[in-house]
């Protein structure tokens, strides 16, 4: 080549001529959807990375596209002469041959470098550049300000086209690529249009790889980052393996920051979500895990997984059921806790009130509707308690020793007349007692307990509270309870038992069941101090009488304490217990009071008589109605049994009738057959008799005729007399039923022949 000294002619290594011809043919073929690895001869080039042309077109900005379009228009005029160089290869491949410019003598090979001349004839390194010739490609890369066309004045070849300053990217050759189906081609185009994530090569972190950004400027040329691991031939080894697009080495170009590599399908590189969904199938439901969940959720998840046979994925219905169960459990737990807190708040509210408020009935009547339902019931039950106040009964202590209140009477009488009444009384006193109050009688009992002077302080403690929420929203609370009474004389008593509370949805008490099982009486040291001072003396002055007196004083102290005195009354004053008994009676007479108020009966005795009579009538009516219902049910059962029996009898009778009818029909048929047979036999016999008689008559007639004929013949011929004796007739005894007819016909014929002969 004849060129200027200031122009640098940089040549690249090329393969054999056959490979150059294949490269020239590939440059004229349209670009496919994705790129493959270059031929083996091209792997010996440098490590400069390039991006496919089609991918650069999608990643270019609007200004670059406009500049590229303008330069394309300029290049179309310059490349008309260059199209003649590929005429032979295009004709060999069956493609249309472009028109050749007569002024164009030849063109360089597409794999060779073009010397770019400089008009100023200076040795500036910025102009020492090379360009890759590709007749089917567009000049892309730098903006229009950096695209400076060069002059070909210093070159001996005047036909050399004017090339842009930016070289074109090299597109690797596709060897024997089979045609793909339309669906796969469309999918590949969609994958190229979508941005694909870039992953670092093996052995490098993402911070070390910068594929889409230029690294440095070397003499005016933007060189791509070369941080990829080099392969065995010196070329880059992409992340996707041999099927991934490879970049030809020794090609410097300007790479856009948005440049990305297009991945072919079924590669090991990064794949888009659609490919990932196709490879892994439809999305599966995530398996429920028990980590980071509450104990209830863990239990429900384990139960559902075991119910579904150990499968992690559950149906939507099962998940909804589990969620509903968890929600209901949470609601029930919160509701039960709220009920317990409501009871504790009520106790705290009462304990913080002043004595004046607690001793007033109006205070209790005000707070009762807020915490109890109008139909609420309060029950107090006590077990066997011994000691205190001798052998007195509870009714004797309270003063309500009435016959209808004497419910603790002995149930059985002993046959021995020498039994002691004291033992009976002690047995009656040790029996448990049951009391029941309503919302109208409970406030007076509470106020009377506070108004007693002997009790200084009362403590209530609840421990071990448990709850259960029912299906209708009610809450049952069960807890241990302890009542501690402190008296003026320094003694104290403790009652231990259980309490059951039923609360409604609005957290109001429906009923309370209080059971006391233990009573303990104690004396404090302060109460014993004064007594002990008077008893204790010097050891020298103590005698047997003094010791005996000390014991008696201690016994009197224990017996006279308030805690021991109130043992039979459960630690409360007899007056308060009297009100409790009256409240129990009034609560049991609640129906009587309602009856008297409804019927406007002022007299309680008359209302009681009418109530008892009406209750008896109601009981009788209810009993009669019950008996009528039972009788009706029994009658219906009997009717059903009879109907069933009749159905069975009818069924059996119908079957018997059917069998009898069949039998009678069979007998009738047999009789008819027998009659028909008899009639046939009779008809045969009569026919035989008639035939025999007819045959005999015919034979007689024939004989007579024959005799006459013979006589006539003899007379006419003058023949032998008595010629009829020679003619014999068959005997009727040996003739069958059919033979006489034949012989009769023959006889007739014979008679006719005889007549004709005459």
Curated annotation (Swiss-Prot):
Q: Which family does it belong to?
A: Belongs to the MFG1 family.
Q: Does the keyword Nucleus apply?
A: yes
Q: Which domain of life is it from?
A: Eukaryota
Functional note:
Transcriptional regulator with a general role in all morphogenetically distinct forms of filamentous growth, namely invasive growth and biofilm formation. May control FLO11 gene expression as part of a promoter-bound complex with FLO8 and MSS1. Important for virulence.
Q: Which cysteines are joined by disulfide bonds?
A: none
One GO BP annotation of this record: filamentous growth
Tell me if Metal-binding is a UniProt keyword of this record: no
What subcellular locations does the record give? Nucleus
The primary site where this protein sits is nucleus
Which residue ranges have biased composition labelled Low complexity?
Answer: 11-31, 117-128, 183-210, 264-288, 408-430, 666-715
* Region feature Disordered, mapped onto this chain: 1-49, 87-293, 408-433, 650-758
Task: State the deletion phenotype.
Answer: Defective in filamentation and invasive growth in response to environmental cues. Defective in the formation of biofilms. Displays decreased virulence in the greater wax moth Galleria mellonella infection model.
The biased composition feature labelled Polar residues covers: 1-10, 100-116, 142-168, 218-229, 249-261, 650-665, 722-734
Q: Subunit structure, per the record?
A: Interacts with FLO8 and MSS11, both morphogenetic transcription factors binding directly to the FLO11 promoter.
Q: What is this protein called?
A: Morphogenetic regulator of filamentous growth protein 1
Q: What's one Pfam family here?
A: LIM_bind
Instruction: Write down any Gene Ontology CC term.
Output: nucleus
Q: Which gene encodes it?
A: MFG1
Q: Any idea which UniProt keywords this protein has?
A: Nucleus, Transcription, Transcription regulation
């Amino acid at each position: 080549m004849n060129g200027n000294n200031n122009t640098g002619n940089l040549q690249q290594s090329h393969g054999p001529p056959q490979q150059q011809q294949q490269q020239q043919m590939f440059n004229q073929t349209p670009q496919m959807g994705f790129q493959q690895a270059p031929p083996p001869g091209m792997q010996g080039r440098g490590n400069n990375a390039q991006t496919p042309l089609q991918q650069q077109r999608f990643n270019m900005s609007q200004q670059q596209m406009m500049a590229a379009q303008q330069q394309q228009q300029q290049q179309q005029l310059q490349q008309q002469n260059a199209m003649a160089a590929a005429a032979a290869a295009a004709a060999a491949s069956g493609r249309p041959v472009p028109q050749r410019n007569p002024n164009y003598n030849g063109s360089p090979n597409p794999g060779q470098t073009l010397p770019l001349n400089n008009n100023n004839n200076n040795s500036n390194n910025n102009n020492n550049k090379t360009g890759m010739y590709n007749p089917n490609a567009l000049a892309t890369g730098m903006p229009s300000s950096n695209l400076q066309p060069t002059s070909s004045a210093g070159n001996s070849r005047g036909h050399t086209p004017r090339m842009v300053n930016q070289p074109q990217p090299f597109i690797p050759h596709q060897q024997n690529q089979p045609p793909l189906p339309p669906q796969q081609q469309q999918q590949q185009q969609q994958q190229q249009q979508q941005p694909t994530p870039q992953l670092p090569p093996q052995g490098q972190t993402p911070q070390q790889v910068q594929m889409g950004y230029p690294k440095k400027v070397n003499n005016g040329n933007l060189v791509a980052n070369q941080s990829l691991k080099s392969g065995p031939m010196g070329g880059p080894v992409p992340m996707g393996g041999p099927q991934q697009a490879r970049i030809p080495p020794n090609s410097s170009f300007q790479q856009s920051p948005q440049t990305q590599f297009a991945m072919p399908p079924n590669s090991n590189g990064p794949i888009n979500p659609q490919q990932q969904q196709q490879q892994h199938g439809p999305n599966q439901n995530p398996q429920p895990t028990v980590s980071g969940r509450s104990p209830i959720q863990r239990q429900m998840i384990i139960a559902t997984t075991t119910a579904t046979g150990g499968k992690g994925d559950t149906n939507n219905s099962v998940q909804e059921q589990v969620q509903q169960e968890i929600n209901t459990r949470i609601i029930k737990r919160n509701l039960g806790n709220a009920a317990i807190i409501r009871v504790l708040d009520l106790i705290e509210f009462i304990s913080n009130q002043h004595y004046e408020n607690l001793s007033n009935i109006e205070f209790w009547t005000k707070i009762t509707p807020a915490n109890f339902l109008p139909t609420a019931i309060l029950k107090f039950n006590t077990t066997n308690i011994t000691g205190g106040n001798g052998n007195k009964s509870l009714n004797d202590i309270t003063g309500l020793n009435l016959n209808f209140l004497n419910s603790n009477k002995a149930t059985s009488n002993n046959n021995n007349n020498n039994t002691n009444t004291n033992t009976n009384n002690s047995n009656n006193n040790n029996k448990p007692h049951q009391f029941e109050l309503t919302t109208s009688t409970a406030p007076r009992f509470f106020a009377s307990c506070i108004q007693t002077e002997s009790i200084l302080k009362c403590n209530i403690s609840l421990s071990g509270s448990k709850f259960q929420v029912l299906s209708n929203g009610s809450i049952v609370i069960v807890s241990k309870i302890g009542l501690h009474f402190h008296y003026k004389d320094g003694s104290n008593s403790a009652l231990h038992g259980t309490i059951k509370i039923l609360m409604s949805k609005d957290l109001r008490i429906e009923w309370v069941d209080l059971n006391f099982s233990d009573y303990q009486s104690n004396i404090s040291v302060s109460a014993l101090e004064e007594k002990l001072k008077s008893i204790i003396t010097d050891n020298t002055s103590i005698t047997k009488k003094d010791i005996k007196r000390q014991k008696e004083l201690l016994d009197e102290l224990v017996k006279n304490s308030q805690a021991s005195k109130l043992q039979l009354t459960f630690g409360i004053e007899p007056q308060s217990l009297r009100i409790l008994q009256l409240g129990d009676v009034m609560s049991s007479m609640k129906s009587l009071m309602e009856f008297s108020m409804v019927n406007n009966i002022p007299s309680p005795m008359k209302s009681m008589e009418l109530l008892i009579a009406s209750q008896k009538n109601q009981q009788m009516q209810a009993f009669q109605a019950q008996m009528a219902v039972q009788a009706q049910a029994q009658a219906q059962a009997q009717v059903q049994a009879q109907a069933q029996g009749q159905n069975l009898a009818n069924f059996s009778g119908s079957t018997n009738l059917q069998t009898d009818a069949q039998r009678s029909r069979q007998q009738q048929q047999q009789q008819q057959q027998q009659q028909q047979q008899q009639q046939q036999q009779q008809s045969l016999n009569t026919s035989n008799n008639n035939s025999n008689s007819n045959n005999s008559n015919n034979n007689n007639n024939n004989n007579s005729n024959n005799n006459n004929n013979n006589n006539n013949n003899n007379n006419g011929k003058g023949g032998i007399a008595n010629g009829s004796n020679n003619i014999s007739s068959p005997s009727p005894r040996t003739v069958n039923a059919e033979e006489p007819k034949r012989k009769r016909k023959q006889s007739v014929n014979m008679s006719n022949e005889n007549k004709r002969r005459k």
